[in-house]
Amino acid sequence: MGEQSFVVHVWGQVQGVGFRYFTRERALQLGLRGYAYNLADGSVEILICGPEQGVQMMLGWLEHGPRTAEVTRMEYEEAPPPQKGGFHTN
């Protein structure tokens, strides 16, 4: 299995509920790198990169997010891998 990299956008009740924090924790558990940033329109943009199995598990988790969030829509597409290591939030 190779590496995969996706940029993901999630909408719903995803800001002010710990979404980025829990996303970072889950990504690090899965050995992924990337970021989770709040956007001005109330959505969250996430870049995830790493082993295919971990990325696929993360995509499944992001469909629902943490218990504190309510994801109403999710879109993703392949993207270049991040320039930096680790997993960052704004």
Curated annotation (Swiss-Prot):
What is one Pfam family matched by this protein? Acylphosphatase
What EC identifiers does the entry list? Answer: 3.6.1.7
The source's superkingdom equals Bacteria
Ranges of residues in domain Acylphosphatase-like: 5-90
**UniProt GO molecular function:** acylphosphatase activity
The keyword Nucleus belongs to this UniProt entry's keyword annotation: no
Keywords, alphabetical? Hydrolase
Task: Enumerate the active-site residues.
Answer: R20, N38
- Gene3D superfamilies assigned: 3.30.70.100
Q: Which top class of enzyme applies to this chain? A: hydrolase
Keyword Cytoplasm assigned to the entry: answer is no
Please give the catalytic activity noted in the UniProt record. an acyl phosphate + H2O = a carboxylate + phosphate + H(+)
Family in the record:
Belongs to the acylphosphatase family.
Cross-referenced NCBIfam families: PRK14426.1 (NF011000)
Please state what the protein is called: Acylphosphatase
Tell me what organism the protein belongs to: Aeromonas salmonicida (strain A449)
